[in-house]
């Protein structure tokens, strides 16, 4: 069978350096949702719950009556105003997005000559930039995956970093992230999981800097993956360039309503409570997995864990046969076939995972 007809699993048995040479588009766009089948116990997708909480469902249901009209400029501004209030920014420094990933699709409009992406991390930025013909330099951080700004080429006029980072669960200090700044360089910080981090979380979203863009997602904490809700905060000139040529009415009324609702004070309090719950569940889960002799990357601060185990690809298949989905790690640059990512879950689901691991390890 030729490479172009080979199955993804066969391709992913190659060494890490070879992964991106075999159908790179497919590998860079491999996400945890493809691991999950109906009825599976899901540790592969980093979304909390099966759907939005009742209060948010009610809010969206009320907004259904507006679907006969085009999304209004007033509603869009009100949502930007609410996001801005949450972060202490101006509404003009907020750009509403159809999911945080849409922000990555806009990065080529900033016309970088060389982009540096910090890995292991989310690979959508690499895919988008390479599709646009932008040279991409992958900076591979070795375990324990702490940021080393000296590894970034000085010539890079765009640097993209996740904080906390998917899949390592590492939270980089704010000072380290800002140390990536250079004259003529734009630093893009993917804070998709920031609202799930207990405490201040080292976010830079509230810092009004003309060379830093922060991308946020509302998908994870609020279980809105199907609605696609997110936003960017950054300098007005940078945001204007990012959305140049964007279609009119880029977000629907329900997306706009969800973004506004999820950044209001009540929702922020709910997210804070959820981050406390995640912190407790993560601590318990680490203890359970550590007792099995698994190596957990850390200190973990996100709602997922990066696990190293010999023969992780075989372990994943054995778990799959038992109706348990975990995220393979070998599609992330810098990781190999001995890594898995598992979402933080409650004790009932962790019991199921641990029982299965006791059998397959």
Task: List each model region and its residues.
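PLP-dependent enzyme catalytic core of the Aspartate aminotransferase-like
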Residues: 321-322, 333-361
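Short, conserved charged micro-motifs
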Residues: 54, 311-318, 348-353
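Active-site phosphate-binding strand-loop segment of PLP-dependent enzymes
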Residues: 137, 141-196
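N-terminal "arm"/small-domain region of PLP-dependent enzymes with the aminotransferase-like
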Residues: 1-70, 85, 155
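Conserved PLP-binding catalytic core of the aspartate aminotransferase-like
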Residues: 278-279, 289-322
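Short loop-beta-helix segment that forms the pyridoxal 5′-phosphate
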Residues: 71, 84-106
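PLP-dependent aminotransferase class I/II
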Residues: 51-53, 74, 211-290, 294-297
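Conserved PLP-anchoring active-site segment centered on the Schiff-base-forming lysine
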Residues: 108-130, 135-137
